[in-house]
Amino acid sequence: LKGRKALITGGDSGMGRAAAIAYAREGADVAINYFPTEEPDALEVIELIKAEGRKAIAIPGDIRDEDFCKKLVETAVNELGGLDIVVSNAGRQQSHASILDISTEQFDWTMKTNIYAPFWIIKAALPHLKPGSVIIGTTSEQAYDPSPDLYDYAQTKAATMNYIKSLAKQLGPKGIRVNGVAPGPIWTPLQVSGGATQKKLKNFGGQTPLGRPGQPAELASIYVQLAADDASYANGQVYGSAGGSGQP
């Protein structure tokens, strides 16, 4: 990825963090977006990117706001000197036993973060993406096998998988590839901050053939490969990493 310029949302932790560090190690300059309250984690990622000798740009802000999403892309392009990799990774996941427990405000928060934000960011980025550029979306095995307590989150991941395939057909003729990563049970802050019940956490990932949850670093190479030029025939694909579970 030498000389490539990447923007990653949710780059402060979990899979976004792992992808950002891996991109830097492969020679890319990286801009990460994150919620302002995650500044300490984000600054750690920035230092790790710089330690690889690459340019690192921190762009805090709330991607539920369309104007900010436009500013995010503009800042990334200006600071990096261009853009050719967009990783739409930020997500909101909250466990609710019943649909009756989800307020309209909570539902809207999930939709804005997981669906609206990629729409706004990709629209803003497209004028800057030249042939050979790549868009990567983080979906989930929840797109194929939704949990009953992740009603809102799971449907956003099904939508993510769908827009990956739709955009791949739309942008392929322009030389822009669009692919996705569908993680299974990966140990990230999403799980321990309300994304899973305490009961689930006790055996999180235990149902997979590998018998354990995955770590974000175990997915990083997928994000690298999908961004690499030698993956030039991968378009509209969703790559799974779920310890033997899941369908992709």
Model features per residue range: what roles?
Residues 91-93, 136-160, 164-173, 185-186:
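Catalytic loop of short-chain dehydrogenase/reductase
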Residues 97-99, 103-108, 204:
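Substrate-binding pocket helix/loop in short-chain dehydrogenase/reductase
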Residues 101, 149, 173, 183-208, ...:
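A glycine/serine/threonine-rich, flexible loop-to-helix segment
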Residues 122-123, 165:
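A short, exposed helix-loop element centered on a Lys and neighboring polar residues
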Residues 172, 177, 234-236:
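Short, small/polar-rich loop/turn modules that mediate ligand/substrate recognition or access, typified
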Residues 208-219, 230:
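A conserved structural motif in NAD(P)-dependent oxidoreductases
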